[in-house]
Amino acid sequence: MKHNALLSAAAALTVLTSCDIPLPETYVLASQSSLPEGLAYDEVTFSFFATAIHGGEITRLSLFDQEKVFYASPDPLVSFSGAHVDAERRLLWVCQVDVKTDPIPNSKVLAFDIDEGALVRSIDLGEPSFCNDLTTDADGTVYATDSALPNIYRIGADDQLEVFASSPQFAPVEPGVLGLNGLDIAPDGESLLVVKTVPPALYRVSLADPSDIAEVTFSGDPFAVPGDPRFPGPDGLEFFGDALYVVYDGGVQQLRFSDESYTHATVRTTTAVPTGLTSITVAEGRLYVIDSEVYRVWYQGQAPELPFTIRRLNPSLFGKP
């Protein structure tokens, strides 16, 4: 019965693909307290996945804004942060962090079978650790940032965990302050771009030689807009075409690199977005961001501005290339 249901769903999705039905401009999340943080998209099922700081749940929003709980942790005190879909292998990768039951953070990297909704892999990063964001390369290898330590981890198909890259530049300025945050692999598949939240910085790490680390320099708008409270530090990031989009609480910056060394970028900025942003992803050839209110609630001690939403980000906000 379950197999037949999956076949029916697949057939329906094939029809939708042929009709080229566009995704909604905005998705509204029902929760009023979850603080959704990470965002990922599955192109096979036309589904968004939103992780949550509160409640230990991962939410799935399918076409036509149908919302359901994809996964509920047996421990509601854990937080889920970064998320990434490996569509080829039908896996949703998520960072799980526990900062509520122990003053020393500990975290795991989890993988879920998207079609079965089952937890299939779990890799413990140890203590202390703060898994913030993650991505995969063409071979399915996972790369994850640690906001508490100056490390980028690599996880292979055998779930073997190793420190892929480490540098004093990546270290938090003091305990409890976020260090490394969002990351993504460049379109050429040879470089990893990763942001540090405090102080704001962007680094290029060679995938072939992780000791080859360069801090990216900028022209155009100032990176992270020093002194502007809408830009408390970079969070999620995503390549869309040859441009890298970096998300802040109250703005987004578009970075266009001068060449494939990915060591210099021209920056353009928009603040024509709601405050509360944390993550960004590509869905059906469009950019979407999640309005989660994490900075407002966690760092400013204020109530969230509801509702939580996933909404389209139009690249035209940055002007012509």
Please annotate each region the language model reported.
Residues 95-105, 292-306:
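Short, conserved, GDST-rich strand-edge loop motifs in beta-rich repeat architectures
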Residues 31-46, 53, 74-100, 125-142, ...:
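Beta-rich, blade/repeat-based domains predominating
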Residues 53, 97-99, 147-149, 197-198, ...:
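Short loop/turn segments immediately following the C-termini of beta-strands
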Residues 62-66, 113-117, 156-160, 206-210, ...:
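Short loop/turn segments that connect beta-strands within beta-propeller blades
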Residues 15-18:
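C-terminal motif of bacterial Sec signal peptides marking the signal peptidase cleavage site
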Residues 105-139, 145:
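Asp-box/WD-like beta-propeller blade repeats and closely related beta-sheet repeat scaffolds
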Residues 57-59, 108-110, 151-153, 201-203, ...:
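A short loop-to-beta-strand structural motif that recurs across blades of beta-propeller domains
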Residues 23-29, 67-73, 118-124, 162-174, ...:
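A short beta-strand motif characteristic of beta-propeller blades
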